[in-house]
Amino acid sequence: MPAPSLNLSFSRPAVSPAEAAPIARATDLSGPAAAVVVARGYDTPARARELLEPTNALSHDPFRMKGMKAIAERVRTAVANKEPILIFGDYDADGIPGTALLANFLRASRAVVDTYIPPRESGYGLSMEQAKIILERFRPALVITVDCGSSDHEAIRWLKSKGVDVAVTDHHLTLKGVPPTPYFINPSRSDGETYPFRYLCGCGVAYKLVQALSTRPHEPVLYDLVALSTIGDLVSLTGENRYYVTAALKQLHAKASGNVGLRAIVETVGGSVSIATIDAVDVGWKIAPRINAVGRMGADPNMVVELLTTSSHSRAMEIAKETHRLNSARQTLTERLFEEAIERIGPSPRDPLVVAYLPDAGVGVAGLVAAKIVELYGRPTLVVNGEGRGSGRAPDGVPLMPIMEQLRAMGLFGVERRLASGKSVTADFGGHAQACGFHHVDVDDLLRAASRVRGGPGPGGTFPVPVDAEIDLSVIDERLVRDIAAVGPYGIGHAEPAFLVRDLRVLEQVVSSTGRQLRLVIADAAGAEMPGIWFNAGEIAGRLPARVDVVASVSYFAGRVQLRLRAARAAKR
């Protein structure tokens, strides 16, 4: 694996101590933590309190979402008349929890409900193939989509012609216009949506429907699945999303979650993860991947809906253990494909967009490999297989959709292609700010287009390493770690804070047994020492300058405060 570069540029600190001082006084945060608050745009005491203590005032009236009245009335009618309802969800850690959430609520309302998640191999969304399966297998009067449906006009028209209403709940951006149904909610819809917060995940949109249907519109017992999807689907952890996540974590810590399946997943994770201490990082790295792993590894994703809807602890544990097994297999496969991708890309890719061609990569793991490449190179990345299918990821703060639109303008998407079999297909993509999926692209054209994308890295071929504030080693203590935790949880749109610490001496360098991690001891000019760790930097051992500037986050590990390095360069005095 290539070693991190020691020639990266660092961005200017976003906030000075003077700018942070008023927020520090108003919130009782330390100066560096207050600087993070200001750097994220919460630059008044009132806004800072919104970040630190989000309330249900951030959970907006669901009827402010265009189309909510119509869809809520149609669902109420179906429930009252005992019409058969099918909830059709996407196969990931957004669509599956959203399907479970809606099913749990409607069943509690005595509705006649079935659920169905298609296999990942069938492709994203409500295709004609899936529409025919739905009609033959379930014969519903009403289909409610979760986390999909906005672009599936043909299937919606066909079902309508067969007497089946389709209610679409979705959050994905689409250029195809409004689907042909009067029952459609999507905060990202393009026809005059005025809902105040457009970054809800698919499960979040399904929850807004539940709010509209409920006599208790703020029902924290349902927040756990919304939080799981919000973190797992890489949507912005700000505003309304932030409220749901913080409320759900408090609920879990108080052991108030009634979701038997979610608790079973936490039990199977084990180690340092428990209901009493679970945080957003645990959800993103330990819980959501287990839900995604089922579909990614070709197993039946409907088992996870059962996991999140069952009241049987023994059945929940049985399924949770299977998700654990599949996730372990997924990790092994992802690592192998990542190593193959790095060999193909080379140690120093220069194109603004990284494109990794992995002929045999299943679409289920392409996004995971892309995310690891983004972490290594800090650049938007597409992973494509031999069928022209794949996934993309982008660094936090680098929107992916404008890049995909550039590729569309170059003629790669939105065009018909004829396959070797003679079948005519349309190359297309979908997704949101940080993640996308695509299919039927011409691989050679995509590889050539990577060098022509605009808005890529700056001079030196990399994006500057973001910095929230500059601090001295002497202020990094347990209080700062606690304050940084208070400013969390962190995720998309609210990344873990990055601090610039200048002119440090490197006293020790030890490579981990895996060869991946580099453990350090560093010291400032006054002789104060601190441990540090730099992930995926084992190959840099022995090459660090004697004195360095670092960009790092702060954490508490094994009873000591430590730095987690993100970048280092020769000290600039």
Regions found by a protein language model. Name each.
Residues 66-179, 184-185, 190, 332, ...:
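N-terminal small/polar loop signature for handling phosphorylated ligands or for N-terminal nucleophile
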Residues 444-449, 514, 539, 544-573:
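OB-fold single-stranded nucleic acid-binding module
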Residues 33, 80-83, 91, 178-349, ...:
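A structured phosphate/pyrophosphate-recognition subdomain
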Residues 37, 90-92, 144, 170, ...:
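Divalent metal-coordination and catalytic microenvironments
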Residues 1-81, 286-325:
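Cofactor-/ligand-binding subdomain signature composed of acidic, glycine-rich
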